Amino acid sequence: MKRSCLIWGCVAGQAWGVFLLRRQRLRGAKKVAANRKLAANLRDTLILLGPTFIKIGQLLSTRVDVLPPEVIQELARLQNEVPSFPAERAIAVIRQELGKGVDELFASFERTPLAAASLAQVHRATLKESGEEVVVKVQRENLLDLFRVDLANIRVVAWLADRLDPQTEAASANWKDIAETSGRVLYREVDFNHERASAESFAENFKTFKAIKIPSVHPELSSSKVLTMEYVPGVKISNAEQLAEEGFDPVHISNQLTTSYLEQVCRHGFFHCDPHPGNLAVDNGYPGGRLIYYDFGMMENMEDNIKKGFVDLIFSIYENLPSEACDALEAMGVLRRGVDRQSIERIARDLLNTFQQTLASADNKWENQMTAEEKKESRRARRAKIGQDLFATQSDKPFRFPPKWTFVFRAFSTIDGIGKGLNPGLYDLSCATAPPRPPPGRSARPALPDGLH
């Protein structure tokens, strides 16, 4: 009851803030500033409410279809880092789960955690027989009980939001579905048996890639609440300065990252949902460096027809085919069937023309002679026209964003940021080239990652 009272007190405070903001009917820069202030308060509230709400906030940071950009940006800053819990509790969980104490299982076990997150913390250890260094991920105590209370309250909040909150422009929000999806993701993430299986599947997909390293799992020392994996240290991928000092090629690392992610999404249909810098590193003990993936708690599968839709979308963008792009969006479940296709294709045509103009800008002597302000004004005019067309279609609410696609789009955005940090010129679209056209009638495009790389 005490927990529920705390949750509803926080909900009431946030709802009152939203009510006051809407009552002011602010526009332009004032509205953006007010949204940022409200979003910062929301972020602090989620941190106060603890693990469940921190994870919910991280999941909501992918929902560009239902939340303002200012809120998305603030929620994206949510981190897993929280104070660690005492080592004695971790040791007790290990004994309960594995049936033996750490002194029986390991030659050494570091009491001070290597890292602590909202759902678990990680300790370094050494195996007795082989002497191999491992990391032991131990789940926080009573997490499932906390989830049950929190998610029950969140479902009620979602029910109220569906009835009181107006729908977003051009897309329909279903807070109940968002709450249910978030709950499923959370329960799956705290099942370490699921994470172990995901890590093994991911490693199998990349077994021929020498430039990609996935830490191996020790199933005999793992359970639903304990996960033991190979210890593979590395340089954080966002630490460009240290990577340069150690002689690594940022272009090579960026290529490894983009190619590996295209492999996941376009070829295997099994992808890492959270490739942020904390889950990626460069193995500085490997000649030339190799990319290390960590944390396989949030993974998604993609059905073959949806995967093909995504591949077709990429090709239709490069080949400037708006009708095919809309077909691909329908196959992906992003564009609703039966909407005003003429209006949507007109928007797609404008977007693709803008993309093609960007591709051609490097060879466009006239555009290269434009001042920075003229280029900025040209881009602003293109965006304004697209925005007007989108506004005209909002009554149909043609777009929807299935949860797995929000993960894909967020992941590509994260990878784009990492890549630009390593090599600002890597994603310059003026240098991009279209992938080779597949043979006529070919339904699959298995060489896509190579073509886009």
What annotation goes with each model-predicted range?
Residues 1-121, 130, 145-177, 183, ...:
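N-terminal accessory/targeting segments that precede structured cores
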Residues 30-32, 36, 63, 178-180, ...:
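Helix-rich C-lobe and terminal helical cap/extension of kinase-like folds
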Residues 50-54, 155-158, 200-203, 391, ...:
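Short, amphipathic alpha-helical segments that act as regulatory/interfacial helices
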Residues 69, 76-83, 95, 144, ...:
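ATP-dependent phospho-/nucleotidyl transfer catalytic cores
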Residues 111-117, 218-222, 406:
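A short beta-turn/loop motif at secondary-structure boundaries
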Residues 124, 132-140:
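Glycine-rich ATP phosphate-binding loop
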Residues 125-126, 275:
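Conserved beta3 strand of the Hanks-type protein kinase catalytic N-lobe
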